[in-house]
Design a protein with these regions (language model features):
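Soluble catalytic regions of membrane-associated enzymes that act on cell-envelope
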Residues: 55, 60-68, 72-74, 80-81
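Short gly/ser/thr-rich secondary-structure transition/capping motifs
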Residues: 33-36, 57-58, 86
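Terminal amphipathic alpha-helical/low-complexity segments used for targeting or macromolecular assembly
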Residues: 1-46, 135-150
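Short aromatic/basic micro-patch
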Residues: 49, 68, 97
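Glycine-rich hexapeptide-repeat left-handed beta-helix
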Residues: 74-150
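N-terminal segments that cap or nucleate solenoid repeat domains
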Residues: 48-56
Length: 150
């Protein structure tokens, strides 16, 4: 975890890297590779720690070195794994962990310091708030997430 003032060089270099991914890497290299080993290789090259057999259908991984996707985990299409937030003109960074066999479903957002436990599922369109911990073998969904009641 780290904090950086809005006007620091770190923040602006970080925005430059995000722009590179959104303007060059995503349209030219990533979008045709969703769900394949190729996107995993590309994201690993940018710094994401990705386990064997992970299924990834999104390129929205800012601060790639702060993200861990476990073995056989799934990141759905349109999902954002967000590792920073701004508050009072300060950029706060923290890790996001998606453990082995877990699923972050389509169009969901995971905020910094969140953890999705082993073999757990976060339903589509859900928001995993900063610091949330989804327990092992659980199903949560909603905005913000809460345990799913069948």
């Amino acid at each position: 975890a780290a904090d950086h003032p809005l006007w620091s060089a770190f923040v602006w270099l970080n925005e430059l890297q995000d722009t590179f991914v959104e303007v060059v890497a995503a349209p030219w290299f990533f979008q045709h590779t969703y769900g394949s080993g190729e996107i995993n290789l590309g994201l690993r090259a940018l710094g994401v720690e990705i386990g064997r057999g992970a299924w990834i259908e999104s390129y929205w991984f800012p601060e790639t070195d702060l993200i861990r996707v476990g073995e056989a985990a799934t990141v759905g299409p349109g999902t954002v794994v967000q590792t920073h937030l701004f508050q009072d003109r300060v950029m706060s960074l923290d890790t996001v962990t998606i453990q082995d066999g877990s699923t972050l479903a389509a169009h969901s957002v995971a905020l910094p310091a969140s953890l999705i436990g082993t073999a757990s599922t976060v339903g589509p369109g859900s928001l995993v708030m900063r610091g949330d911990r989804v327990p092992t073998n659980a199903v949560w969904q909603g905005n913000p997430i809460e345990p799913w009641k069948r």
